[in-house]
Amino acid sequence: MHLSTGYCIFCPLVLYYVVTLLYFAKRKEEFAMAKPIVLCADSTCDLSPELIEKYQVKIIPLHVNLGENTYSDGVDIHPDDIYAHYREHKELPKTAAINMDEFLAFVTPYLEAGNDVICITIGSALSTTYNSCRLAAMEVEGLYPIDSNNLSTGFGHVVMAAGDRIAAGMPAEQIAAEVQEITQKVEASFIVDNLEFLHKGGRCSAVAMLGANVLKLKPCIEVSNEGGKMGVSKKYRGTLDRVLEEYVADRLAGREDIVQDRIFITHSGISEERIAIVKAAIEKHMHFDEIYITRAGCTISSHCGPNTLGILFVRR
């Protein structure tokens, strides 16, 4: 009787371990069979050159139309060029999406070399770039388009999440599914110091701009996880230094739903002193393993102008 009872207890344990070993063996086999993966993102992800190199991201630039010329974002035009042109001509650029043929030309060499390609784009509410990538994926096998539902380093968080999973050996299909879910957890917002660029771009009236300047109002632009739509969530009042501290406190203080591995401070051209104020405010309210400081590219810069700054992180 004693041996029989022990046998009954022992058998389920053996079965459990056998099933577990078989499961992980199968997963290991799946990972081993997975094709090598090339990670691609459009130029609006605003990752630093160091992070682009670390994650081996292949960047495909959006087009920037300024004056009578068309440029490649981040290649032959940068935010300071936009600011200089605006000061002289009071004209802002217009960005143009990457089309399907451009995507196909960009990814085909990687696919023909035997790779899968994960391509992450700016939010679909902000550009037709994602739709172009989706249409390209219908023409070829092995291309996995992901709508970041964001912009700037909110989008950059999504790229890094994909890069982490590529490094872990996951297959492309699984990465695409997991990362698409993460896009709903990215929290991105920016403080705008001056409404001049928003007014010039048709995003606020002259009256609103004048009132904001007189009252020293600084709007917080928040990015929705529904395609990356942007809207005003709160209007702060006071000097920029004071507003930035209050803004960081509003985003971080007392929260327990934030992933604390990394956070971005992303700006469109601002003083080192103000970056230091924001970094100190972050450290006051929450510990992050990494605080990345990056310069926003042409998209955010042409919308909001200089002295725009945001913190961007991921919720659990």
Model regions: which residues?
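Generic low-polarity alpha-helical segments
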Residues: C11-L13, T20, G123, F197, ...
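Mixed-charge interfacial surface used for oligomerization/domain docking
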Residues: K35-P36, T44-K54, K58, H63, ...
